[in-house]
């Protein structure tokens, strides 16, 4: 996961 998506188990903050 590169962005915060609904239903995503892994949340990776990239900026």
Curated annotation (Swiss-Prot):
Keywords: Ribonucleoprotein, Ribosomal protein, RNA-binding, rRNA-binding
Domain of life: Bacteria
Ubl conjugation among keywords: no
GO CC annotations, alphabetized: ribonucleoprotein complex; ribosome
Any one GO molecular-function label of the UniProt entry: rRNA binding
Assembly with partners or alone: Part of the 50S ribosomal subunit.
Function recorded in the entry: One of two assembly initiator proteins, it binds directly to the 5'-end of the 23S rRNA, where it nucleates assembly of the 50S subunit.
Family label: Belongs to the universal ribosomal protein uL24 family.
UniProt protein name: Large ribosomal subunit protein uL24
Organism: Brevundimonas diminuta
Taxonomic classification: Bacteria, Pseudomonadati, Pseudomonadota, Alphaproteobacteria, Caulobacterales
Encoding gene (name): rplX
